[in-house]
From Swiss-Prot:
Known function: Involved in production of the antifungal phytoalexin zealexin A1. The enzyme sequentially oxidizes(S)-beta-macrocarpene via alcohol and aldehyde intermediates to form zealexin A1, a maize phytoalexin that provides biochemical protection against fungal infection.
GO cellular component terms attached to this protein's record: membrane
Primary gene name: CYP71Z18
Coiled coil is among the record's keywords: no
Record's protein name: Zealexin A1 synthase
Keywords: Heme, Iron, Membrane, Metal-binding, Monooxygenase, Oxidoreductase, Plant defense, Transmembrane, Transmembrane helix
Membrane topology: Single-pass membrane protein
Catalytic activity: (S)-beta-macrocarpene + 3 reduced [NADPH--hemoprotein reductase] + 3 O2 = zealexin A1 + 3 oxidized [NADPH--hemoprotein reductase] + 4 H2O + 4 H(+)
PROSITE patterns linked to this entry: CYTOCHROME_P450
Pfam families: p450
Domain of life: Eukaryota
Organism: Zea mays
Length: 505
């Protein structure tokens, strides 16, 4: 097998060199954005793999080469955007030119050949899927309809924590948060806790990890030989088939429940999709594969980002005790005398500081630091530079949100920076784009925030939080794990102390 791989790589190298020589002779010279020096065949990859977190490596490179920087990841031209002005040029001024997604072979497999909305190619099918998602799955009314689910899952979460507090135990809060968000999202998506839940989430976790890998097949997409030898491709096929098997069973069971008149089955996202599937007037065909691809989007984008943001909120509050005390005082004053908090309570209370905490966590710890890559649909000029058709584009929102030119004390957690500010995460303030901007902005931001706000308020209301013996706030690790989503690298282990016991604790 090793000999085959070496032969394949050698063949690709020869083809790549000949192709570049031909291009140099036949193509006019372009004014490309600056970038670091490259090596034959691998291009700029050696600059990126020096750091396990590519967005950090890209920030350092951008300091030298500018806010529009060209890298070559193997044979893939890659534009890195690292300033608000450049982000606005890509996501607003030239939004249509960059409205496509860069899809590698593994992502194409996982999304049933790009049938989904998040990674689907820009066009009529994509427009209809996005419209359907925004109006039917992620609308304010749909998010509101899941209120009871969120309240029940938060109450269950609080009872579990109260039991640990009574026993004097420490907890891995990051794991508990992930479990809580997953349970909530499964019920919102499928309608109830699912016996296949653990299997599906395990397959999804593998799929997301494979999608983020910098595999040989993905950096040399023109080589069919390397594609066929790629282990990432085989992992993607196995993960997709496992998810399809589980989702297929869920779809069949949901259809049976709907046919039998089970009203509870009509409350979930998957039931909405299956109901629309029967609509003859729908301008696109909503096949079972499309439904499964959309469920991949919803789970992948919804569960990880919400749990990651809630974990970072608690991490930073533990690191900054004065900020924690201020947030707790606001929540405890607003809900004084209550044994549990509901979303109706949240809507009537003016928890201004709590919202600032969430905003600041999203700034300092953007859930998807490079967003999802776009692709240049047509050759164009951006800020005086030529951008070739097919260029992969990363917007480094992690770097932009930590740029000291736009943020005072950029590396510090200061929710107060948003006081007397109109900045929001709706994609119109280009120095603050945790959910992106333009046609490819994440449409599920409202659901993601709704899934974490009640939980955060409850964590602050019901419990005080202590670090394990011997640890100081400054010792809490804030390094991110490698991957598409910037999860906390080390679990947040804390000792909960009951302040106001939740109901039935």
């Amino acid at each position: 097998m090793e000999d085959k791989v070496l032969i394949a790589v050698g063949t690709v190298a020869v083809v790549a060199v000949l192709s570049k020589l031909k291009s140099a002779v036949t193509k006019p010279k372009l004014n490309l954005p600056p970038g670091p020096w490259t090596l034959p065949l691998i291009g700029s990859i050696h600059h990126i793999v020096s750091n396990p977190l590519p967005y950090r490596a890209m920030r350092e490179l951008a300091h030298k080469h500018g806010p529009l920087m060209m890298l070559w990841l193997g044979e893939v031209p890659t534009l890195v955007v690292s300033s608000p002005e450049a982000a606005q040029a890509i996501t607003k001024t030239h939004d249509v030119s960059f409205a496509d997604r860069h899809i590698n072979s593994t992502v194409d497999i996982l999304t049933f050949n790009g049938m989904d909305m998040v990674f689907g190619s820009y066009g009529e099918q994509w427009r209809q899927l996005r419209k359907l998602s925004v109006l039917e799955l992620l609308s304010a009314a749909r998010v509101q309809s899941f209120q009871r689910i969120r309240e029940e899952e938060v109450a269950r979460f609080m009872r579990s924590l109260a039991a640990s507090a009574s026993a004097g135990a420490t907890v891995d809060l990051s794991k508990m948060i992930s479990s809580f968000i997953n349970d909530t999202f499964v019920r919102e998506s499928i309608g109830s806790r699912c016996k296949y839940q653990d299997e599906y989430l395990a397959a999804l976790d593998t799929a997301i990890r494979v999608a983020a890998e910098l595999s040989v097949g993905n950096i040399f997409p023109s080589s069919r030989v390397l594609q066929s030898l790629s282990t990432a491709r085989r992992k993607a096929i196995a993960s997709r088939d496992e998810m399809a098997r589980i989702l297929g069973q869920i779809i069949r069971e949901t259809k049976e429940s709907m046919d039998q008149g089970d009203k509870t089955s009509n409350e979930s996202m998957i039931s909405v999709l299956l109901r629309l599937q029967k609509d003859a007037g729908l301008p696109i065909e909503l096949t079972d594969n499309v439904v499964m691809a959309l469920m991949f989007d919803l789970f992948g984008a919804g569960s990880d980002t919400s749990s990651t943001t809630l974990t970072w909120c608690m991490t930073e509050l533990v690191r900054y005790p004065a900020t924690m005390a201020k947030a707790q005082a606001e929540v405890r004053e607003a809900f004084k005398g209550k044994t549990t908090i509901t979303e109706d309570d949240l809507s009537t209370a003016n928890l201004r500081y709590l919202k600032l905490v969430v905003k600041e966590a999203l700034r300092l710890h953007c859930p998807v630091p490079l967003l999802l890559p776009r692709k240049c649909r047509e050759a164009c000029q951006v800020m005086g530079y030529d951008i070739p058709k097919g260029t992969c584009v990363f917007v480094n929102v992690w770097a932009i949100c930590r740029d000291p030119r736009y943020w005072e004390d950029a590396e510090e957690f200061k929710p107060e920076r948003f006081e007397n500010s109109n900045l929001d995460y709706k994609g119109t303030y280009y120095e603050y784009l945790p959910f992106g901007s333009g046609r490819r902005m994440c449409p599920g931001a409202n659901l993601g925030v709704a899934n974490l706000e009640l939980a955060l308020a409850s964590l602050l209301y019901h419990f005080d939080w202590k670090l394990p013996s011997g640890q100081e706030p400054k010792d809490v690790d804030v390094w991110e794990a490698a991957g598409l989503v910037a999860k906390k690298n080390i679990g947040l282990v804390l000792h909960p102390v009951s302040h106001i016991a939740p109901v039935n604790a």
